[in-house]
Each structure stands twice: as C-alpha cells, then as structure tokens.
C-alpha cells in the first residue's frame, strides 16, 4: 500500500480537485492521510464530503508545511509514501508509474517522475531537465545534484515517492524553513539513498496568480540562506569525491539564487558579498559578473533592470 500524504492549509478552492486526482488513479492500493494544519477556511469541510474509508483526516494546530508532512509520515501505514500538495494534481498513471519504479529498481529508496506547470488559465509550461544519466524512459538518477544544478529541480514535492524508512532516517522535513525546505530534503536524501526516475510528466504543479511582493521575497531570502547553510554542512561531511563535486555545482547555483533574491529586495550590497563568497567557493567570475554589476547600482535602478 502507498500512503499519500497531503498537508492542508486554507485550500478550500483546490483540495477537492486534488483529492479527485488521487481517486482517479489506475493504481488503487492507497490510503490518503490529509493533515489539516489549522485551516481557518472551509478546507476541512471539503475533505469531509468525500465518503471514502481510505481518507484519514488528521488535525493539528498550525505549525507549517514541514510539520504537517512529518505528521503525515508518522501516521502513514504504508511502506511507501507519496507526497502531494493540497492545490496540485496527479495524472491517472502517476501512482502506477511510481510503483513500477519501486518494483523495477529494488536498489532505490526514492522514486520520482517529471512534472509540468499549469497556470490558472490552463496554460502548460514544461520543465527543462538536462543531463539525465540514462537514455530510456526511466532509470537510476545517479547524478541528482548535477541535474539539479543545470535544470528545473528534477524532483518537486508532488512528484516524489519514498520509502518511509528512508525519509525517517534523515529526520523528515526540516522545521523552521519556509521556502526550499523540500529541496533541502531531496538533497539530504540524495547523499544517503539511490533515486529511480521516470521522464513521464505525471504531476501538475498549479501556479496561482500572486505577485512576489517585498515581504515574500524577504521571507525567501531568509529561507534560502538557511538552506544554503545546510547544504554547505552536507558538503563538508561528504566523503565521495564524485558526489561532492556535483554537490559543489548545486551549491554554487544556490549562491546565485540567494544573491538574486537580495537584489529583488533592494539589498545590493548583500548580493555582492554573496557573489564573492560564491566565487571563493568555486563559482566563476563570468557567471556572477551580472550580479556584481546589479549589486553596485542604486536599489531602485537595479530592481527595475532585474525585474
């Protein structure tokens, strides 16, 4: 049995569509663990309208998405856990494909597929995934960090299934990080476990219209900084030279993300400091030169040019 874990917080308009996409799976041996993280809208009522014994609704006071996912992991009865966010969807073959990877690659503990973005008007944007280490439809993703350093993230929070023992071994999802907590979790799994991956696009990340205002960007800046610190700790502990080299490229990309966000919120001087740290770590002057230039411009001008 696969345990589908869905963290839920104020998604009354989307949760029914999300649950329906699970019930429409061709693979039907699953349970759904919905963890309500203190919703204040009608999300819970929407879930309760589904008359199916495979749904378990767990309530907790608001503690954030990582805490909700961790509670779902704890409550899960299956050996395999598939994560799905309360405002996204799966295509009908999703769980069957993931279970197929589980059967085909017994040496792996993490299973993932490709995904796509869909906006509120139905426009679909595909991901760009480069340097997969296999030619066929699926295979072992032996170079996760290399792929992640030059592509969209090959794995997202709605396109992954993992053995319960593997996610518990790394302590679940990190608490206190509000953005990028999922990517840090995949990184921690990547240094400990083997990944199986399918090129099939079977998960739909639904984008809502929301402008990136300064307060949201500031929150991301803090979170991205926390993730970067944790990635550097992984790098310092890693003994495998090949994996360490790939992780280094991934960290340099995070330095760039962190610096760009600083420019977004008008902190050009911080962006310059981050760029210098990245170049000391191994980033090239060429790749960070635009950030250095933007960081030296007046805040208003740099934001206009950047955005």
PLM regions: where:
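C-terminal subregions of glycosyltransferases and related glycan-biosynthesis enzymes
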Residues: 207-307
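Flexible acidic/His/Gly-enriched loops in nucleotide-sugar-dependent glycosyltransferase catalytic domains
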Residues: 65, 95-101, 107-166, 170
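A conserved acidic beta->alpha catalytic loop
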Residues: 21, 28, 36-45, 61-63, ...
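Cell-envelope/extracellular polymer assembly enzymes that use nucleotide-activated donors
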Residues: 1-3, 21, 31, 184
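Glycine-rich, basic loop-to-helix element that forms the pyrophosphate-binding segment
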Residues: 60-76, 97
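Short, well-formed alpha-helical segments that are part of the catalytic scaffolds
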Residues: 11-24
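Conserved nucleotide-sugar donor-binding catalytic segment
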Residues: 74, 134-225
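Short aromatic/hydrophobic "clamp" motif used to bind/position activated sugar donors
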Residues: 81
């Amino acid at each position: 049995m696969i345990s589908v874990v869905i963290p839920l917080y104020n998604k009354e308009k989307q949760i029914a569509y999300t649950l329906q996409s699970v019930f429409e799976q061709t693979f039907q041996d699953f349970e759904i663990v919905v963890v309500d993280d203190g919703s204040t809208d009608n999300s819970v009522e929407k879930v309760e309208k589904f008359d199916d014994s495979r749904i378990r609704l767990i309530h907790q006071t608001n503690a954030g998405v990582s805490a909700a996912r961790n509670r779902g992991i704890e409550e899960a009865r299956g050996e395999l856990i598939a994560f799905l966010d309360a405002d996204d969807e799966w295509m009908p073959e999703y769980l069957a494909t993931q279970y197929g990877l589980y059967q085909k690659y017994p040496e792996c503990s993490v299973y993932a597929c490709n995904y796509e973005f869909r906006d509120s008007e139905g426009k679909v944007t595909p991901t760009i995934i480069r340097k997969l280490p296999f030619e066929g439809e699926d295979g072992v993703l032996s170079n996760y960090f290399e792929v992640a350093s030059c592509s969209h993230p090959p794995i997202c929070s709605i396109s992954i299934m993992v053995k319960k023992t593997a996610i518990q071994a790394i302590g679940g999802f990190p608490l206190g990080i509000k953005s990028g907590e999922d990517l840090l979790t995949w990184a921690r799994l990547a240094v400990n476990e083997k990944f199986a991956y399918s090129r099939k696009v079977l998960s739909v990340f639904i984008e809502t219209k929301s402008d990136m205002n300064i307060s949201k960007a500031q929150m991301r800046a803090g979170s991205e900084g926390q993730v970067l610190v944790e990635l550097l700790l992984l790098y310092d502990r890693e003994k495998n030279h090949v994996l360490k080299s790939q992780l280094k490229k991934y960290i340099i990309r995070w330095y760039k993300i962190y610096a760009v966000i600083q420019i977004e919120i008008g902190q050009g001087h911080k962006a310059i400091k981050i760029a210098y740290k990245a170049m000391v770590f191994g980033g090239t002057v060429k790749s960070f030169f635009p950030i250095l230039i933007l960081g030296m411009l007046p805040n208003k001008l740099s934001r206009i040019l950047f955005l």
